[in-house]
Amino acid sequence: SQVAPIYSNFLNLNHCAFGSYSMRHQSLTLLLTLACASRASGFKWMANFKPPSIKNIKQQIDADNKFGDTKLVVLTGTSSGLGAKTAKQLLNTGKYHVVGAVRDLDKMDAVVELEDFPNRHLFTPMHLELNSFESVRSFCASLDEFKLGKPLDRLICNAGIYQPSLDHAKYSEDTIEQQVQVNFLSHFLMISLLMPDMARAPDPRIVTVGSVTGNDNTVGGGGVYPIADLKKLEGLKAGLKKPISMLDGYNFDGAKAYKDSKLCLMMTANMLHDRYHKQTGIAFSSIYPGCIAESPLFREKRPWFRKYFPIFMKYITGGFVEEEEAGMRLFQVAHDPRCSKSGVYWSWNGGPREGRGEEALEKGGQ
């Protein structure tokens, strides 16, 4: 099984990756002995001191020339909907270099023109297939080469697929149900590969995009069948390999597979906060930006649903939110100093940012 190693390797990350003091350089023995004898703990950093090589100095200069003072962001699912609107907001500040992780580079180029992205010199599209673990690893390797030693400041796990109308499971390149792999497992793998590097950044944040449908305490999650329910994760424990399609090990249900995957992504943010926030300084959070009823996410729903669902959400439930507004909300969680707190679930319903959304920011989320 490919799933078990991904999960277990992440939970067993070597703590040494986040820093520990050890006496590695014999030439500093005397100085360290004197420092320890005098309890001058401030000198202990010398135990790890390694003179920078010419190669490292050149790489640092190249990185400074390439990125300047901008923060480096990876945003998945940048070529449509929420991702495109969020990228535009990030670029508009001039403070971020955005790496758009997308499946279709030609489509991404068209969206850049259509959305009239500002500061295009600060945007770099890179290929990523979330239905392939190998592609995730390849993307992370390419990113490492691209950033020239600069630490990653933001990782926004936004990309997702929704296949509620399927009567049978579609499987990924790794023979795992597509929604579970794209929405959850591949993002999980990406986090595990990039997190040690992000710990070097001064103000790192990892943001996962959840869904109200994964929260059974809400009308959208607990009042609409099927309800997200992982049970004892028997499907995941069994390896999630075909023909197993559901995390709970039960028969396939397209809508529930989506809800379960989003629930796992939100739970992951909480788990990461509990296990790694203090060690790494990374702020882990998840967000539900409101119901983007006109989102391309619903492209596989029936035509009548796509026509009437936005009307229902706008005039009956009040939960409707425009893509532009949702993009601003995701941008805020990645950028706003008020959103630097870790372990927070940022949740908006409908309405403008000046209403309940601003109250959520002031209260520190949910």
PLM regions: where:
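Polar helix-capping/helix-linker motif
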Residues: 114, 132, 335-336, 361-366
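Mobile gating loops/cap/lid regions near enzyme active sites that modulate substrate access
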Residues: 297, 301-309
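C-terminal helical subdomain
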Residues: 310-359
